[in-house]
Amino acid sequence: MELRPFATLTLAVASDGLYMLGATPAGTRIVQEINEARISGPRLNATLVGNAAADWLAIDAQGVGTFDIRMTLMTDDGVPIYLAYKGRADWSGGMGKSPVFVGMEFEAGDERYRWLNALHLFGRGEVGEGGKLVYEIYEPI
């Protein structure tokens, strides 16, 4: 499979939006609200809008993190789009110590962005400066 760069996604989490649910059937469940997000690329540029953005993270007994992230973005030209992605990270050495690998999908109703509906993108995320999570996103070609 060949991949080409699609965009960079940078997220910041809300320090007051962390909810530790504890042990659940899925593992230790942590809900972390996202208060900043920006996706930047040659074909898509958008910023987080609204208050309904979070990661529903579960970490199993072996330290594997399973991510479930959803948010609404507003493109720079004023079109709302939905982004959802899931992925995994081997955090047996500690949270944030290894990359996060994800599969991403968009939903768009506006004709200018319907092309996003056909994509399944792949990302590699790392914890960067200031605790922000930075994903390099790739598109299969």
Located regions from the model:
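Beta-strand-enriched cores of mature, soluble protein domains
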Residues: M1-I141
